[in-house]
Amino acid sequence: MSEVQSPVPAESRLDRFSNKILSLRGANYIVGALGLCALIAATTVTLSINEQLIVALVCVLVFFIVGRGKSRRTQIFLEVLSALVSLRYLTWRLTETLDFDTWIQGGLGVTLLMAELYALYMLFLSYFQTIQPLHRAPLPLPDNVDDWPTVDIFIPTYDEQLSIVRLTVLGALGIDWPPDKVNVYILDDGVRPEFEQFAKDCGALYIGRVDSSHAKAGNLNHAIKRTSGDYILILDCDHIPTRAFLQIAMGWMVADRKIALMQTPHHFYSPDPFQRNLAVGYRTPPEGNLFYGVIQDGNDFWDATFFCGSCAILRREAIESIGGFAVETVTEDAHTALRMQRRGWSTAYLRIPVASGLATERLTTHIGQRMRWARGMIQIFRVDNPMLGGGLKLGQRLCYLSAMTSFFFAIPRVIFLASPLAFLFFGQNIIAASPLAVLAYAIPHMFHSIATAAKVNKGWRYSFWSEVYETTMALFLVRVTIITLMFPSKGKFNVTEKGGVLEEEEFDLGATYPNIIFAGIMTLGLLIGLFELTFHFNQLAGIAKRAYLLNCIWAMISLIILLAAIAVGRETKQVRYNHRVEAHIPVTVYEAPVAGQPNTYHNATPGMTQDVSMGGVAVHMPWPDVSTGPVKTRIHAVLDGEEIDIPATMLRCKNGKAVFTWDNNDLDTERDIVRFVFGRADAWLQWNNYEDDRPLRSLWSLLLSIKALFRKKGKMMANSRPKRKPLALPVERREPTTIQSGQTQEGKISRAAS
């Protein structure tokens, strides 16, 4: 009896057919040409308003139906659909809304149109960059350790405090790599004796530089000439590496000799000003997550990963092939990567955080850092434009172009915010369109842009927060943008201040006064519009009524964004010098020394940490309440297969939660604390532990942030932190045991190689 063959699945047949068609000579060009013709036809076909409304409604329904999928093809389809809707909007704007009565009206209208063209250009480039994120996985190193390369770890510093730098140095000394194949260097542009002495004490090497020319790039170039490792790991002086950094990130460099750079994410264990100051900040992804979670991963597909200045491994041969780090701009990192790629080198990105640093503490500092970034990227755009010159593929050119021109955002952002004032103050209607036409063209364009971004960005960036980030800095960056475009050689490298405390809550007027003035003007314009609609409604012509209505709605949206940006300036107290990091680590707590045996501890009690810091640790454990005074203890843990034992003092214990402070009295203990807090291989794997974006929820969170602007002093932080659930401990307190200081029941504790 013949065997019955099962039918070939329809999807498989379709795939086979499409593959056969595309395998024909010239098929890709034919399909591309047909697709382009279809796109042009779809975006330029003339429809009545009612027909366009039907098309817009169908596109929205298609989005909701297709958007339920999770595949990469679904994302690409939604991006193409969004681009199609946006191109129809652009066609409408160019052909039907530029009907101006005066030169002033025409000038204002064209200015708005240019801002919209920039926004659409950035939208399409973002779709191009993220069309196929690579999601590169770590590659194993050779089995034979003798085949592992030599590595120089550079930690450049200029005027940062030793208390910050020493943590990074100790973390670097603890990286799991053959001791004879790694050297840790403090690159001190300040030539400070205490740094040199610390290097001697801890086992690091010290390179001082007197002239400080070319800032960080000059410091790195100075060190390259005095070192010889095959690879260079660069860490900003506050970026503390995990123990597994090199073993996770080095495999690709060893396997592929063409890779010049392996970049990893910049993760921050302290909150940035937006997270710390806004009411819902702790439930919102950090500003940098979009770049390191989505954009860099997309750039990697196009072989266009940028060097970000830290948390990156570079091949010495590649750096030397371009004459060292670029010194022509204040963003030496991106410029260096561009120069290497022009020489034919590849770059790579690994979306695994293997180091963590301090975010900018104050809004003023944050804006200053972004001003430097904007100046540097615009400088590169002027002096080494990626669209000109040789050595780059088209995908690389577009990715670099997107990065550089993204810092032009300040001028379009101000134009978008201020545009409704043209009518509310001066009666200049700069978009000649009825509300029905806006509903048919503009609203679908905005819907698809926002909704598609939410699908692509998931939990890496929430809707409407980009507008707040940009608005916070826009009025400061306008001047920088114009001056740098005109005079690219102007400007100098500014070191971003890190670390510090804020004793009292305060309002940062210096960082918010432009937006306060802007919001006041916007409020006045909105009141004028509402007054006209309320008291002169019957006297207004039909077109004037519609214009007032649209511009009042626009002004309200602008005002919401401005108020959210102003709310960031309400600086909350930061009295802890040591930032707490949420971490759940199984530990065993050994109680006070036995009488007459000062180095012997007893009563082993298991527990689970809640949060850790360089100052101490909070542990959930079955322990009686303690309120009579400090209790000497030792905290034992197993980290990455190795045991660690740290002396600590219990300050209090209540309801099963004990609070300890470290007895940090020597360098070896500090080394162990750094490893316990920052050096765990899995320390930052939950860096994107945020829910996927939902635009309406995100909008609501912005409104809550504005409400918090008017909160009573000191009230915000109590309500903004997400509440932690108590950890369930399925353990009981053990019978008394004893342990010698520096040992465990299994034997002597081994420390990280230094």
From Swiss-Prot:
Q: Which GO terms describe its cellular component?
A: plasma membrane
Fetch the InterPro entries from UniProt. Answer: Cell_synth_A (IPR003919), Glyco_trans_2-like (IPR001173), Glycosyltr_2/OpgH_subfam (IPR050321), Nucleotide-diphossugar_trans (IPR029044), PilZ_domain (IPR009875)
Record comment: activity regulation: Activated by bis-(3'-5') cyclic diguanylic acid (c-di-GMP).
* Known function: Catalytic subunit of cellulose synthase. It polymerizes uridine 5'-diphosphate glucose to cellulose in a processive way. The thick cellulosic mats generated by this enzyme probably provide a specialized protective environment to the bacterium. Binds c-di-GMP with a dissociation constant of 30 uM.
What GO annotations for molecular function exist for this entry?
A: cellulose synthase (UDP-forming) activity; cyclic-di-GMP binding
Which annotated residues bind substrate? 236, 238
Name its cellular compartments.
Answer: Cell inner membrane
| Membrane topology recorded in Swiss-Prot or TrEMBL | Multi-pass membrane protein
Q: How does the entry describe the domains? A: There are two conserved domains in the globular part of the catalytic subunit: the N-terminal domain (domain A) contains the conserved DXD motif and is possibly involved in catalysis and substrate binding. The C-terminal domain (domain B) contains the QXXRW motif and is present only in processive glycosyl transferases. It could be involved in the processivity function of the enzyme, possibly required for holding the growing glycan chain in the active site.
**What name does UniProt use for this protein?**
Cellulose synthase catalytic subunit [UDP-forming]
User: What residue stretches are annotated with the PilZ domain?
Assistant: 574-679
Q: Which residues form a coiled coil?
A: none
Q: Which Pfam families match?
A: Glyco_trans_2_3, PilZ
What is the originating organism of this protein? Komagataeibacter xylinus (Gluconacetobacter xylinus)
Give the source lineage, highest ranks first.
Bacteria, Pseudomonadati, Pseudomonadota, Alphaproteobacteria, Acetobacterales
